């Protein structure tokens, strides 16, 4: 068995086991993930990491989405990669990333706030980019933490700091784009899981003397759902491959992937709930954590409008004659 197969098998087993613990606290979920070394997936082996590729990251994060894993494995993977690239030390506990930052950095100290931070209240370190600098805030230094959750009950906290000491290094990374990669992979997995559940339910639920999956109209809707799920997976694979090849210059592929994933969510979740009916909306039912996450992730790290504008500007900038050659030259990175 290859290293990639071993990685995927380990992630599938661990995430599946953790997903079954619906009432488990954060520490009970995060502890096994951290102990298994998943946060260090993109850190080179020479620096104590797994030495995985961006495609490995896609596979792991897709499985996190498939199992609706309630902890920030993607954010931790990106945080560890950023810290390693910047030559900064890895923290002992959870390191996460801040989608939004508002404040001032002066002489190695930060005053302001970071918002929408995945599990920010649980984090040892919070990474953000401000004025071309990667800054690492210590969670314990927060003057105040305002706990918030997205519609899927995932922690999205706001932390306030006053004259807090930070570690920092020059950084050109776009945290919105990196976060969009995380969400695209998670969306791909959650779409696949919701599709599988919808097909299984359609083959079990009977109306008018036969399984509802035998009705042509429903079969057509599920076929469209399958197309959307496949499109998200293809776009996600391409974006992660481009990130591995082009680094920060992969914005076009990231924008296309996150936008494609966002669009697919509306189609896929509508079909899933049409198939399941009322039971699909109950919190106890396994479809519920998937679709609530999909609706939440659609607006995180860039909504439809944000990534549409990014794509539009790049198309216009390339010009009519150069756009197609540019696009095809970057295909299948």
Predicted regions and their residues:
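Alpha-helical interface subdomain recognition
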Residues: 1-67, 181-333
């Amino acid at each position: 068995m290859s290293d990639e197969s071993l990685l995927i098998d380990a992630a599938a087993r661990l995430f599946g086991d953790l997903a079954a613990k619906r009432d488990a606290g954060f520490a009970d979920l995060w502890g096994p993930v951290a102990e298994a070394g998943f946060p260090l997936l993109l850190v080179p082996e020479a620096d104590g990491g797994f030495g995985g590729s961006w495609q490995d990251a896609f596979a792991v994060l897709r499985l996190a989405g498939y199992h609706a894993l309630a902890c920030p494995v993607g954010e931790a993977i990106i945080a560890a990669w950023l810290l390693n690239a910047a030559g900064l030390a890895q923290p002992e506990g959870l390191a996460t990333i801040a989608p939004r930052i508002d404040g001032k950095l002066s002489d190695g100290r930060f005053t302001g706030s970071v918002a929408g931070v995945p599990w920010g209240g649980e984090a040892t370190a919070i990474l953000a980019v401000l004025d071309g600098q990667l800054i690492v805030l210590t969670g314990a230094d927060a003057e105040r933490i305002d706990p918030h959750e997205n519609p899927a009950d995932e922690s999205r906290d706001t932390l306030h700091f006053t004259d807090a000491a930070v570690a920092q290094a020059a950084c050109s990374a776009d945290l919105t784009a990196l976060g969009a990669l995380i969400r695209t992979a998670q969306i791909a997995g959650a779409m696949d899981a919701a599709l599988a559940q919808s097909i299984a339910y359609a083959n079990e639920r009977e109306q008018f003397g036969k399984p509802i999956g035998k009705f042509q109209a429903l079969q057509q809707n599920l076929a469209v759902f399958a197309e959307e799920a496949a499109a998200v997976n293809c776009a996600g694979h391409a974006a992660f491959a481009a990130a591995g090849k082009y680094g920060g210059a992969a914005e076009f592929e990231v924008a296309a992937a996150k936008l494609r994933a966002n669009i697919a969510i509306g189609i896929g979740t509508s079909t899933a709930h049409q198939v399941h009916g009322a039971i699909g909306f109950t919190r106890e039912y396994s479809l519920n954590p998937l679709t609530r996450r999909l609706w939440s992730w659609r607006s995180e790290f860039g909504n439809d409008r944000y990534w549409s504008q990014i794509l539009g500007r790049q198309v216009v900038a390339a010009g009519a004659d150069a756009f197609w050659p540019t696009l095809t030259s970057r295909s299948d990175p």
